[in-house]
Amino acid sequence: NEFGVSIKVLGWNKKWEGYTDKVVGVLEFIETKNDEDIIVFLDGFDTKINKNPEHLISVFKKYDTKVLLSKEPNPMGKYIAKTVFGDCKGNNIANAGLYMGYVKELKIYLNDTLKSKCKDDQRNFNISCKKYDFIKIDEEEKIFQNISPNTFNKNSDAIFVSYPGSLSFNRTIRAFIEYSQFLYIHVLCLLLIGIILFPHYKKPLFYVGLCLLTLYILFADKSCI
C-alpha cells in the first residue's frame, strides 16, 4: 500500500470453507495479543487504504466505543438487506468486511457470532451486535466506508474504503445459494399473487415457482433458517 502500513494477511494458502473462516482467522490472530491492543480488520481483495491512518487511533477513540463496525450501504434496498442480514444499531446494518476494536471485546463479540449455526458471517454480526453495548456503527463513515455500485465514483473521506466486487456468473450462483433461504417465501408469494391477478399466465407462473422451489430444495444453503 502507498502508506507503508504493515498488514498481516490471514487465511493465505488455506482452503476456503465459508465466510466464517474470516472470523476464525481473526480470533486465531488475536489470541496472542494483549486485551488492550486495537486490531483493524479489512477484507483483502476489495478494500483500499484511502487515507494515511496516522490519526486512526485518535479518531477511533472519539467514537467512545470498544468495537466499531462499518455500515452496509444497502445497494439492494433497505427491506431486502434487513431481511437477509437483520440490523445492528440505530436501524443500521453492519457490514462484516471492515471493523476494528479492542482485543478483549473483539474476542467476546466474534466468539458469539460463531455460536450461530448460520454460515453467513454478516447475518451473525448483526444478530450478535444487538447483545452488546460496547459496539457502535461508523455512521459518520470517518474510518470505514463501504461503497455501493450506484456511488462507485464517489470520492470518500474515510480512511478505509471497500468497493463492490464485479458481477460474475460465480458470484450470482453463490448469491442464490446463500441468500435464497431468506427470500424464497417472498418470491413464492409474489408468484402466487401473479397467478391470482393474471390467471392467463397461471401455467407458466406455476412452473416458474415449481422450478425455483426445486432449485431451492436441492441447492440452497438453509443454515440460517
Where are these regions (language model features)?
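Conserved beta-strand elements of beta-rich interaction domains across eukaryotes
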Residues: 14, 46-47, 54, 74-75, ...
